[in-house]
């Protein structure tokens, strides 16, 4: 299944969106990086791109930046999740 999924998507960004969708709480970048098995610095670069695409937004709570999906991001995550289910 992993190989089929990788044919269609860049694995880490897609997994980040799906992970944010499945867990409705706002998330920290470091936790998200661990969930998708990448370094924190790589996760930050991906998240910056997702923010530019208006798929995620950040909320600062003191020193911590929390991440959540936008409406558009949720729609994209739903589509990725559906496709992932179809190619299993």
Question: Which functions belong to the PLM regions below?
Answer:
Residues 1-3, 74-88:
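Amphipathic alpha-helical dimerization/coiled-coil segments
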Residues 1-16:
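Short alpha-helical segments that sit at the start of domains
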Residues 8, 23-24, 61:
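Helix-turn-helix/winged-helix DNA-binding modules
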Residues 14-19, 75:
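Pre-recognition alpha-helix immediately N-terminal to the DNA-recognition helix
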Residues 18-24, 81:
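Short, locally clustered residues in the helix-turn-helix/winged-helix DNA-binding domain
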Residues 25-34:
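Short acidic, hydrophobic short linear motifs in intrinsically disordered regions
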Residues 37-52:
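Short amphipathic alpha-helical interaction segments
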Residues 53-62, 68:
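Beta-hairpin "wing" of winged helix-turn-helix
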């Amino acid at each position: 299944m992993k190989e089929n999924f990788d044919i269609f998507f860049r694995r880490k960004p897609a997994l980040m969106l799906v992970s944010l969708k499945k867990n409705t709480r706002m998330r920290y970048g470091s936790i998200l990086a661990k969930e998708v098995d990448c370094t924190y610095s790589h996760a930050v670069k991906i998240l910056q791109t997702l923010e530019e695409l208006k798929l995620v937004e950040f909320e600062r709570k003191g020193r911590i930046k929390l991440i959540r999906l936008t409406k558009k991001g949720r729609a994209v995550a739903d589509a990725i999740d559906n496709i992932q289910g179809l190619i299993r």
